[in-house]
């Protein structure tokens, strides 16, 4: 849980200690301002607080940093400050209809309508156009026949009328009255001609219908396959260059994309599917369905998919459950699992009906859990201190021990005469970016995802599933087996107040981590490991660092809600102390932490001490018999000789020691670094642990063998390193052993995989770690920070232990202070 100021000796050995203090706590440009990487633009970061001790957070106007993208993106129009120019442009647009965008769109739409109404996409005439052309040609062929027919008809009428007239006028015998046609005969003749005319007109009217029938019987496509002609490289002159489809067109009601039918497209504005089996060539029947053979094909495809899924899904479920069962037997690795399969095989054979309907879907419902391994799944809504016991077994065994050097759990641990040898579970239930960078590295720097608060807020509704998967995968039962096998005997478990409750608009995932904490304690019991409870984040944040949950202002005992959060933190301890005062935890939870690293360099010291006294009395009143720890607050340990003299009994002072956050210590070479531990730290810890010359029983709750600050996100997300001179913006000072003499220090070696470490470097790392074990062993003992990391090899006890630069057994180191410092071979000092 390191931060950029975690060592109590942070200011000792500085070239200018006062400058360094001002840099961090007064008006540090590193914290106040960031710079644009390309433009070197200076701006205040979001959520920046001018003074960590201030009660209010000023807001800044983002308009000062308004960014105009036109210079970089030609698609973004430049802003014009020429008002007259813009007025002239608008007037020209109004005078010329072609210059008007909307008019251009309408013209383009009309032109495209005429074009699409005549020609298809391939440049060939549409069906409607061909029909019109056929009818035109047929009409042209029929026109001469009609004219001849009408001429013959007219001549017959004239001959008939002339003959009748001659017969009436003639006096010849042949034309006498006895031979004249009667009126009836003339009427019959006239009727005959009329019937002939009617038949001809009927034939003319029938001709278009017959022609349409002949067209329906024509083949739609020929024997040879046809392809659409490609679009021309250049638009023909006079033809509009309209888009195929345009968002503006659609918004203004222009035609949709044409739905093509085989043989050519329908007219523009037409988007109807034709039923291919019985289309009669008309535009009616807009409700026609797709052809039967197409519907049948899709039904076949859907049926095949259903059958495949019916086979695949059960097989996948069975394999997933088998995988989870195998993990239970062998103990899965605690490395991050990239699969999304939950560990729920223990639900097999159980009925969801065993969970009361009122509790189904709640935090007490195992069917909502991502991981059910080693939980008691028998439902109970019983609580202690308002906290659920769901998942716990009703019996337990405290006869176990991790090794023969340690008494079993049901016997007292000899604190003071035998040192604690423990590890932390950092980054697990209280997330820290440098331990689990995979949760943070996929976001842009603009998102400002820098801690668990901003991460959960960004994840939104998926926060619970994402965070619980991390809980289930990051630490498993196998880790506790490995801790035992490494010779360790204590585990300091980090958790935060949102394991119990959340307040106001907290985005944290509430209450899920509680059951993982309880299961971890049961794993510790199983392998004889004693537990140190460590509340890492309390309401309001006790230090404003990312590992408290939220980076920024300290809101605990400080600011507008300082007293409110003081009470909330006491309420938190009231609940968890009642819970862990149960008899089942008496032998396994032997150290009880109050709050991790309150920043007493910024908080009123008396307020912190008064709260510490109140909290200790509260938890002891509730039945806690474990040792209660108070952190040194980063004050010089010598000051604690006079502090909390009238404290309650059974308390430990907790100090955290690192060399890499102090610029006077990070520059030490390998040998001098070991000397610092065995000379200065050894005597300092030994003295503070005594009641006569120091404070009393003291533990070192955090330390590591890291000799650089190179790990990703170690100094906060987006922050550089002291080792390479990138830690402070505007200050490129390099803090490493060869900074003045060369060669240049690089993080490449420190961040390399452990398999690439040289034998000399591994020897140094192990000696460096064992020297600290020796120094802290002069007091109550130590807890290494931390057990497991995703990639920071120098911060993972497990990685060091498995790769040969940590003692095989923590209780049997190869080096102790007082021994000759071994040679590290040709190990370069910049390594």
Swiss-Prot record:
The keyword Signal does not apply. InterPro entries: Glyco_hydro_5, Glycoside_hydrolase_SF, Glycosyl_hydrolase_5. The chain crosses the membrane at residues 298-318. Its EC number is 3.2.1.58. One of its GO terms (molecular function) is glucan exo-1,3-beta-glucosidase activity. Residues 1-297 are cytoplasmic. Glycans are attached at residues 376, 381, 393, 410, 442, 546, 558, 610, 636, 669, 689. It catalyses: Successive hydrolysis of beta-D-glucose units from the non-reducing ends of (1->3)-beta-D-glucans, releasing alpha-glucose. The active site is at residues 597, 702. Glucosidase involved in the degradation of cellulosic biomass. Active on lichenan. This is Probable glucan 1,3-beta-glucosidase D. The lineage of its organism: Eukaryota, Fungi, Dikarya, Ascomycota, Pezizomycotina.
């Amino acid at each position: 849980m390191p931060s950029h100021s975690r060592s109590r000796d942070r200011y000792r050995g500085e070239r200018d200690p006062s400058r360094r203090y001002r840099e961090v706590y007064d008006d540090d440009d590193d914290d106040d301002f960031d710079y644009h990487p390309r433009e070197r633009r200076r701006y205040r970061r979001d959520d920046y607080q001018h003074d960590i001790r201030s009660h209010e957070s000023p807001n800044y106007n983002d308009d000062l940093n308004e960014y105009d993208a036109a210079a970089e993106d030609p698609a973004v129009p430049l802003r014009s400050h020429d008002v007259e120019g813009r007025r002239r442009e608008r007037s020209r647009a109004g005078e010329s209809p072609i210059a008007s965008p909307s008019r251009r769109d309408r013209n383009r739409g009309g032109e495209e309508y005429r074009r699409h109404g005549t020609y298809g996409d391939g440049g060939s005439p549409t069906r409607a156009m061909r029909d019109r052309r056929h009818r035109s040609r047929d009409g042209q062929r029929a026109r001469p026949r009609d004219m001849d027919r009408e001429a013959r008809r007219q001549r017959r009428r004239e001959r008939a009328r002339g003959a009748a007239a001659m017969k009436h006028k003639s006096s010849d015998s042949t034309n006498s009255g006895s031979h004249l046609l009667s009126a009836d005969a003339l009427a019959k003749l006239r009727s005959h001609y009329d019937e002939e005319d009617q038949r001809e007109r009927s034939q003319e009217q029938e001709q278009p219908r017959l022609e349409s029938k002949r067209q329906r019987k024509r083949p739609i496509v020929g024997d040879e396959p046809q392809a659409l002609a490609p679009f021309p490289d250049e638009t023909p002159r006079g033809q509009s260059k309209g888009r195929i489809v345009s968002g503006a067109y659609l918004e203004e009601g222009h035609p949709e994309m044409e739905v093509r039918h085989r043989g050519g497209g329908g007219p523009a504005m037409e988007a109807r599917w034709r039923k291919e089996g019985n289309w009669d060539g008309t535009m009616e029947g807009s409700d026609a369905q797709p052809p039967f053979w197409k519907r049948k094909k899709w039904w076949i495809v859907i049926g095949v998919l259903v059958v495949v899924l019916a086979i695949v899904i059960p097989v996948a479920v069975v394999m997933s459950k088998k995988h989870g069962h195998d993990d239970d037997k062998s103990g899965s690795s605690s490395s991050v699992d990239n699969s999304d399969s939950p560990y729920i095989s223990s639900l097999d054979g159980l009925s969801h009906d065993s969970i009361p309907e009122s509790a189904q879907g709640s935090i007490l419902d195992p069917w909502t859990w991502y991981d059910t391994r080693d939980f008691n799944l028998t439902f109970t809504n019983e609580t202690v201190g308002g906290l659920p016991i769901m998942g716990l077994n009703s019996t337990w065994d405290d006869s176990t021990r991790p090794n023969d050097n340690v008494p079993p759990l049901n016997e007292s641990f000899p604190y003071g005469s035998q040192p604690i040898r423990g590890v932390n579970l950092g980054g697990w239930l209280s997330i820290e970016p440098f331990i689990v960078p995979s949760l943070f590295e996929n976001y842009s720097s603009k998102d400002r995802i820098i801690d668990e608060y901003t991460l959960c807020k960004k994840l939104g509704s998926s926060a619970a599933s994402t965070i619980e998967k991390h809980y289930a995968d990051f630490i498993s039962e196998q880790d506790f087996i490995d801790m035992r096998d490494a010779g360790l005997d204590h585990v300091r478990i980090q958790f935060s107040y949102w394991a119990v409750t959340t307040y106001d608009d907290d985005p944290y995932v509430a209450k899920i981590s509680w059951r993982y904490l309880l299961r971890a304690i049961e794993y510790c019991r199983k392998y004889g490991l004693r537990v140190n409870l460590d509340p890492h984040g309390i309401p309001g944040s006790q230090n404003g660092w990312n590992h408290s949950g939220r980076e920024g202002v300290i809101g605990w005992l400080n600011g507008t809600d300082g007293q409110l959060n003081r009470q909330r933190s006491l309420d938190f301890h009231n609940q968890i102390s009642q819970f862990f005062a149960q008899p089942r935890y008496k032998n396994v939870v032997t150290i009880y932490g109050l709050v991790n690293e309150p920043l007493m360099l910024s908080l009123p010291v008396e307020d912190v001490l008064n709260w510490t006294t109140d909290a200790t009395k509260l938890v002891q009143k509730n039945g806690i018999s474990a040792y209660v720890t108070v952190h040194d607050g980063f004050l010089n340990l010598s000051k604690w000789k006079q502090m909390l003299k009238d404290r309650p009994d059974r308390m430990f002072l907790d100090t955290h020691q690192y060399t890499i956050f102090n610029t006077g210590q990070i520059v030490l070479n390998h040998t001098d670094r070991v000397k610092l531990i065995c000379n200065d730290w050894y005597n300092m810890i030994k003295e503070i642990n005594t009641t006569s010359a120091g404070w009393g029983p003291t533990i070192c709750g955090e330390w590591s063998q890291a000799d650089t600050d190179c790990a990703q996100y170690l100094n906060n997300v987006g922050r550089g390193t002291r080792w390479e001179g990138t830690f402070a913006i505007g200050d490129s000072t390099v803090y490493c052993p060869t900074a003045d003499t060369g060669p240049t220090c690089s993080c490449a070696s420190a961040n390399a995989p452990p398999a690439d470490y040289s034998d000399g470097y591994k020897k140094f790392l192990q000696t460096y770690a064992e020297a600290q074990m020796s120094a802290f062993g002069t007091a109550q003992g130590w807890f290494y920070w931390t057990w497991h990391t995703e990639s920071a090899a120098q911060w993972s006890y497990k990685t060091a232990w498995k790769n040969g630069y940590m003692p095989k057994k923590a209780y049997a180191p190869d080096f102790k202070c007082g021994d000759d410092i071994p040679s590290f071979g040709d190990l370069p000092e910049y390594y």
